[in-house]
Amino acid sequence: MPDTTESLIRQIYVLAQNRKIEPFLESGDDDFSFAIRGLSRYRVSTYKQRGSLAAVIRVIAFELPDPALLGIPDSILQLTDLTKGMLLVTGPAGSGKSTTLACLIDRINSTREDHIITLEDPLEFLHRHKKSIVSQREIATDTDNYLTALRAALRQSPDVILLGEMRDHETIQTAMTAAETGHLVLSSLHTIGAANTISRIIDVFEPSQQHQIAMQLSMVLRAVVSQQLVPAIDGHMVPAFEIMIMTPAISNMIRDNKTHQIDGIIYTSAKDEMRSMDSSLLQLYQSGTITAETALHYSTNPDMLRKKL
């Protein structure tokens, strides 16, 4: 079986055309995508285990699904009205961040005459030019790394930049500078909740830099969408969202190192299109989509949520 598996994985690299297998054989891990014309696109994670090769392959639809069918609320899609600043989509691995970001890019592509540059590792959804021009660059195929690609993007006359992930302080700093200089920057982090996301960004930097970074972040951040996929009663997975929209009060909290108070603002600001994770879970429970046990399991404050069930 291992020999057969290795042969299949080598064939996958052949199908991926520009992807070389040698770096994977040396490092033991790789992540990429490829397409078979007329069939589908695939995202592949290859790795070594017990001295042999293994892979996980996921099918990616050629066409983006309807955001409404995915459960993405209009309040998130309306964030594409932003023309500058930073918009973050966060959540654990496999929570659908890439799909949400792709839907946001597609909305901009369909409604605005912009130049959109996406920097992804790997490319998942392919965007046709609609009203916008979309340049999609894949890390390790079209460019060396996120930081190099982001710095180059600033010289390529972008209106919108999608940065697949902010992995280090230099990339985060450059992304904030891009947002500060009149671009709309969309990116993702593996965090749950706006407060945790903001704290994570600031904590990446040295203590001597953190106050300045907090000041800069308070000025460029426009919204944080945090999502989880939760099991529905019918066996499918459905998204639950937290939505934080920047307000003067939240901006002051970031500057004053009071990010722990942001959750309270989100809980009490439904009129400003904000939504807490628990209110999203409660709505899913009340609609009969998920069980009470599931809602409590994924809740950020199960004691408070239990009183509302």
Feature annotation, model-predicted:
Residues 1-309:
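Short, flexible helix-loop junctions that flank or precede catalytic/ligand sites
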